[in-house]
UniProtKB/Swiss-Prot annotation:
<comment type="similarity">
    <text>Belongs to the chaperonin (HSP60) family.</text>
</comment>
<keyword id="KW-0067">ATP-binding</keyword>
<protein>
    <recommendedName>
        <fullName>Chaperonin GroEL</fullName>
        <ecNumber>5.6.1.7</ecNumber>
    </recommendedName>
</protein>
<dbReference type="GO" id="GO:0005737">
    <property type="term" value="C:cytoplasm"/>
</dbReference>
<dbReference type="InterPro" id="IPR027409">
    <property type="entry name" value="GroEL-like_apical_dom_sf"/>
</dbReference>
<dbReference type="Pfam" id="PF00118">
    <property type="entry name" value="Cpn60_TCP1"/>
</dbReference>
<keyword id="KW-0963">Cytoplasm</keyword>
<dbReference type="InterPro" id="IPR001844">
    <property type="entry name" value="Cpn60/GroEL"/>
</dbReference>
<dbReference type="GO" id="GO:0016853">
    <property type="term" value="F:isomerase activity"/>
</dbReference>
<comment type="function">
    <text>Together with its co-chaperonin GroES, plays an essential role in assisting protein folding. The GroEL-GroES system forms a nano-cage that allows encapsulation of the non-native substrate proteins and provides a physical environment optimized to promote and accelerate protein folding.</text>
</comment>
<dbReference type="InterPro" id="IPR018370">
    <property type="entry name" value="Chaperonin_Cpn60_CS"/>
</dbReference>
<keyword id="KW-0547">Nucleotide-binding</keyword>
<keyword id="KW-0413">Isomerase</keyword>
<feature type="binding site">
    <location>
        <position position="493"/>
    </location>
    <ligand>
        <name>ATP</name>
    </ligand>
</feature>
<dbReference type="InterPro" id="IPR002423">
    <property type="entry name" value="Cpn60/GroEL/TCP-1"/>
</dbReference>
<keyword id="KW-0143">Chaperone</keyword>
<dbReference type="InterPro" id="IPR027413">
    <property type="entry name" value="GROEL-like_equatorial_sf"/>
</dbReference>
Amino acid sequence: MAKMIAYDDEARQGMLAGLDKLADTVKVTLGPKGRNVVLDKTYGAPTITNDGVSIAKEIDLDDPYERIGAELVKEVAKKTDDVAGDGTTTATVLAQSLVHEGLKNVTAGSNPIALRRGIEKAADAIVKELVAAAKDVETKDQIAATATISAADPEVGEKIAEALDKVGQDGVVTVEDNNRFGLDLDFTEGMRFDKGYIAPYFVTNAEDQTAVLEDPYILLTSGKLSSQQDVVHIAELVMKTGKPLLIIAEDVDGEALPTLILNNIRGTFKSCAVKAPGFGDRRKAMLQDMAILTGAQVVSDELGLKLDSVDMSVLGTAKKVIVSKDETTIVSGGGSKEDVAARVAQIRGEIANTDSDYDREKLQERLAKLAGGVAVIKVGAATEVEAKERKHRIEDAVRNAKAAIEEGLLPGGGVALIQAAAKAKDDVKLEGDEATGAAIVFRAVEAPIKQIAENAGLSGDVVIDKVRSLPDGQGLNAATNEYEDLLAAGVTDPVKVTRSALQNAASIAGLFLTTEAVVANKPEPPAAAPAAGADMGY
């Protein structure tokens, strides 16, 4: 494919135009009085959202230089979303302000490399002040307040606070569709996975069609159980104890399944067979999680273990197991707390090191099943479009609340950035173009509060001047247009969100300013129209 090349100011201005188109679309959503953006979909109903990264992902510009500029800012939003789960609009607004201020100075003759160093040093100094000003989350009300700000809905804030209070920081809060209007909250006790009994003959409770095993032994195997010999040996060992047996295997079929069912129906031996969840390496990892939780050992050919020769030491235990048609829940596994804690630490390390969103999500689910629990917020609304929009807001608010628990809270509404910058100025001693780069950051941090004020119908400059004269922690509550103590009023932002927004914006701004040439794909010429049919003489 042919390429287009632009240099110097032409390259930067083309990229800047793309940045502005994306940022101007995203920033209308900032603050409690921000507006929504409607996203057209090729199939199905349009999506209505105020989530910066969702809007950014949908923007695809025709001009190749503009497209590159927009893609760089998308990266700001995506990186902030990956790290903190929120703050994508703030990051976009900061990036736009930093790039505009920086390009003015590049055009005036400043050295882009020195500007970039100054921007990075000033951003680091402000982040240091933000972290120092953090207030730990100590109450359920504080979690509710920060989730309410993110979702713009007090009911959502309360539900999220209740969910996180129950499942803990390592727990998972998922958001699902509800077939009735409103919000419902469900909790899962113990480890639950999406596989049910292999045959309905294992059911012990006919009313709700579940198999309930009290104080069972648990056999975990990575292979299939097909022959009678695969189950008879272990069944005879467990039968002597008078306790039931849960079998979790790749599959149970052939002679093995009717052997278990027949003993179950006769009342000779109570058991239940379930397929192992997941596939491939993920299945192996989940079986190992269950082994650690229950104190079992996974029986597999790789370890040289055979079902016809193992003893009771490979079996795990649990207080109770509940198996339905579609899912299995293991309550109070008998594994060692130290082993569970070590496994949790290992999974946390894997989460920190993975670059895949899908892998991260699956690892977090495994972490929750081991260390916390699972809460499900079910969302119902009058229309599909409204339900999707509300669901999206709740997902953002959950991640916002988790970020607050992790690193603490700051005054919201863009105030923390201005007040941290005022303190950081004294620590940043630079000269020349590096000092100019730092000054760019100290001006750019005003952009979020200015945009919040303008979205609320106020003058941004007037609000900034007023906030500068107020004590630390006080600022504009844009929801009420009152100046007050923002932490006391529940107007807060997680430290993780605010610092990630600034760090990612500063990083992309530095790349923008130091760009001297852009190589882009040349647009394909439009296809020629098909030739008209020949005149047949009629």
